[in-house]
Each structure stands twice: as C-alpha cells, then as structure tokens.
UniProtKB/Swiss-Prot annotation:
Primary subcellular site in the record, as a coarse category: nucleus
Gene that specifies this protein: MED28
Subunit structure: Component of the Mediator complex, which is composed of MED1, MED4, MED6, MED7, MED8, MED9, MED10, MED11, MED12, MED13, MED13L, MED14, MED15, MED16, MED17, MED18, MED19, MED20, MED21, MED22, MED23, MED24, MED25, MED26, MED27, MED29, MED30, MED31, CCNC, CDK8 and CDC2L6/CDK11. The MED12, MED13, CCNC and CDK8 subunits form a distinct module termed the CDK8 module. Mediator containing the CDK8 module is less active than Mediator lacking this module in supporting transcriptional activation.
One Pfam family from the record: Med28
UniProt GO cellular component terms: core mediator complex; cortical actin cytoskeleton; mediator complex; membrane; nucleoplasm; nucleus
Keyword Transcription (UniProt): yes
MF terms (GO), sorted A to Z: actin binding
Gene Ontology terms: biological process: negative regulation of smooth muscle cell differentiation; positive regulation of transcription elongation by RNA polymerase II; positive regulation of transcription initiation by RNA polymerase II; RNA polymerase II preinitiation complex assembly; somatic stem cell population maintenance
Tissue: Widely expressed. Highly expressed in vascular tissues such as placenta, testis and liver.
Family: Belongs to the Mediator complex subunit 28 family.
Protein name listed in UniProt: Mediator of RNA polymerase II transcription subunit 28
Organism the protein comes from: Homo sapiens
Biased composition regions of type Pro residues, renumbered to the chain: 13-23
Chain's role: Component of the Mediator complex, a coactivator involved in the regulated transcription of nearly all RNA polymerase II-dependent genes. Mediator functions as a bridge to convey information from gene-specific regulatory proteins to the basal RNA polymerase II transcription machinery. Mediator is recruited to promoters by direct interactions with regulatory proteins and serves as a scaffold for the assembly of a functional preinitiation complex with RNA polymerase II and the general transcription factors.
Amino acid sequence: MAAPLGGMFSGQPPGPPQAPPGLPGQASLLQAAPGAPRPSSSTLVDELESSFEACFASLVSQDYVNGTDQEEIRTGVDQCIQKFLDIARQTECFFLQKRLQLSVQKPEQVIKEDVSELRNELQRKDALVQKHLTKLRHWQQVLEDINVQHKKPADIPQGSLAYLEQASANIPAPLKPT
C-alpha cells in the first residue's frame, strides 16, 4: 500500500494513519491526525458531530436567555461555528486525500465512477426531455382542439341579423300586467 499523502501539499497536516492490518477495506475511519489534541478513541466524524451539537447548544443555551451580554453571546457562537468549520475542513481534507490515494492506486475505479455518474446524468436528462415532450404533446393537442372548435361554421349563424334573431329567441317574453 502506498504511503500516506499527508503533508504533500504545503500547509496540510499529515494524513491519518493507515488501516490496521487485520481489516482490509476499512480505514480506521477518520481517526484523528497525529499530533492533534484529540482523545485516542475520537474520530473526525465524532468531533464533527459534537461540534455541530455544540453550535446548536450555544444557540439554545439557557445562559443566553437569562440576559447575557450580546457581544459575549456572539463571541461564543462564533467560536463554536469556527470550530465546526475547522473540523469540517479537516474531514473534507481526509476524504480528498483518500480520493487521491484511490486515483493513484486504482485509476480504473475512478474512471468507472465517472462513467457511472455520466450515465446517471444522461438518464436524468433523458427523463427530463421525455417529460417536456409529454407536456409539449399535451399542449399541442389542446391547441389543435381549440383550432378545430373555431373552424366549425355550422354552429354559428352567418350575418348580424341571424345573430340578433338567435339572441332574441333566448330572451323570455314579458309578463302581462293583470
């Protein structure tokens, strides 16, 4: 197996440790990077989850409801959000490193994934085209029906006199006073 790619780019922390030998295919999923101040059993996913919960906890904390200074509240919330964003970046970096390792070790797998994504996108777009064609046929039929209705001259009497005769036939006769 290739060496970890951590530290390859400037400013990046070294990558996470490799999977234990007895568990092929299972990287010690997102274990904390060496040198980071984390408990040994903690993973990036656990930290991401706890920092996410801390963000909400800071927003609904009873301490803030009891009239704490607005600036103090803002500072506390900003710190929680910043911690969450930092851990999210570390998690993203981990997955990008794993993706890079995969592309180096198994380039055919990356190509297969790309082809699969392209097929899925083509299917989605084909379905969308079919949906639009169905709507187009429906509205073409509606327009055709309207045109057919306007072309039936037998139903409408010709001339203004015929129109007045038809309209007056529908008016009820006045009642005679008694």
